[in-house]
């Protein structure tokens, strides 16, 4: 018999909100009787944007901004119907992107 697995990938700009959301998901899945692996921290994407400070000249004067995207991975092995139902009803904060694969 093949094992069923739900893979949840979480993305957010703020790592504190991301860790709270991951902890809620793990707690909900364990409470409903499923085996949970994670949260596994994935590499953080860092995007750097360089812009000119001045509008017209002074090309040597530049400013850099960066945007970090933090990611976590959670695997739920052999989920019960109660697990899926509890995860559907779970209320997570805005700012967290959730990608679910069955």
Curated annotation (Swiss-Prot):
<protein>
    <recommendedName>
        <fullName>Small ribosomal subunit protein uS10</fullName>
    </recommendedName>
</protein>
<dbReference type="Pfam" id="PF00338">
    <property type="entry name" value="Ribosomal_S10"/>
</dbReference>
<comment type="subunit">
    <text>Part of the 30S ribosomal subunit.</text>
</comment>
<dbReference type="InterPro" id="IPR018268">
    <property type="entry name" value="Ribosomal_uS10_CS"/>
</dbReference>
<dbReference type="GO" id="GO:1990904">
    <property type="term" value="C:ribonucleoprotein complex"/>
</dbReference>
<keyword id="KW-0687">Ribonucleoprotein</keyword>
<dbReference type="InterPro" id="IPR027486">
    <property type="entry name" value="Ribosomal_uS10_dom"/>
</dbReference>
<dbReference type="GO" id="GO:0000049">
    <property type="term" value="F:tRNA binding"/>
</dbReference>
<keyword id="KW-0689">Ribosomal protein</keyword>
<dbReference type="InterPro" id="IPR001848">
    <property type="entry name" value="Ribosomal_uS10"/>
</dbReference>
<dbReference type="InterPro" id="IPR036838">
    <property type="entry name" value="Ribosomal_uS10_dom_sf"/>
</dbReference>
<dbReference type="GO" id="GO:0005840">
    <property type="term" value="C:ribosome"/>
</dbReference>
<dbReference type="GO" id="GO:0006412">
    <property type="term" value="P:translation"/>
</dbReference>
<comment type="similarity">
    <text>Belongs to the universal ribosomal protein uS10 family.</text>
</comment>
<dbReference type="GO" id="GO:0003735">
    <property type="term" value="F:structural constituent of ribosome"/>
</dbReference>
<comment type="function">
    <text>Involved in the binding of tRNA to the ribosomes.</text>
</comment>
